[in-house]
Each structure stands twice: as C-alpha cells, then as structure tokens.
UniProtKB/Swiss-Prot annotation:
It comes from the Archaea. Its main location: cytoplasm. The gene is rnp2. This is Ribonuclease P protein component 2. Its EC number is 3.1.26.5.
Length: 120
C-alpha cells in the first residue's frame, strides 16, 4: 500500500488572485490567441524570473463576450495588470486588455465583474 505525501495546510499554500479582463480589438480573438498574448506579455514585461514568481495561469475565456479570467500570485497582481495594459497587438491585429476587477475567488469574480457579460 503506497503512502501519499501529506498535503500542505492552507496557511502554507500559495495565495492566488483572479483577474477578470476584457479584450477590445479590431476582430474577435480565440482562446489560444489570448492565452499566448497573456504569456508573451508576462515574459516581455516581467522577464523569465518575474513570470515565474507571478505564476500567471490562464483560467477561462469567453469568445462571444471577449472576456476572461487569469490567475496570478497575490503579491504580483499589479505587475500582471501592468503587463496586460502594455499589450497593443495580438497576432498583428490592434487590441487592448481592459482589467475589469480582481478577486480572491472565481465565484465572486464572476458575480461581481463578469455577470453583465453573461457569465454564470
């Protein structure tokens, strides 16, 4: 019988924040394009070490409303917001990221910032 390692208690785990964003551009973008744009923005602005510390993680994207959610370490929220604000082009098309809000849970983020875009 294999023994599994103990899980970390909540006090020792990394704390995350979730950022709701909207993409405004010349055309509609796919999930993969947005995922790549977030990662490239993080790497170009924060660098490899900064991106590793911020731990940006793409959660969800609604292609119809062009809104989405990205997870980030709580100490680096403002850095990722800054990186997203610097995006001007996605795959050669003009586009910008508009940050709608930040929350500690996905449920509250959807209720507070994304409900007007049809998220449930």
């Amino acid at each position: 019988m294999k023994e599994r390692p103990k899980t970390l208690p909540p006090t020792l785990r990394d704390k995350h924040r979730y950022i709701a964003f909207q993409v405004i551009g010349e055309r509609t973008f796919t999930k993969d394009e947005i995922k790549r744009a977030i990662w490239e923005a993080s790497l170009s602005t924060l660098g490899t070490l900064g991106s590793a510390r911020a731990k940006p993680w793409f959660i969800k994207f609604n292609e119809k409303s062009q809104t989405g959610i990205v997870r980030v370490d709580r100490k680096h929220v403002e850095e990722l917001r800054f990186a997203l604000a610097l995006v001007t082009h996605i795959n050669g098309s003009k586009a910008i990221f508009r940050t709608l809000g930040v929350s500690g849970t996905i449920k509250r983020l959807k209720r507070k910032f994304l409900s007007e875009f049809g998220w449930k």
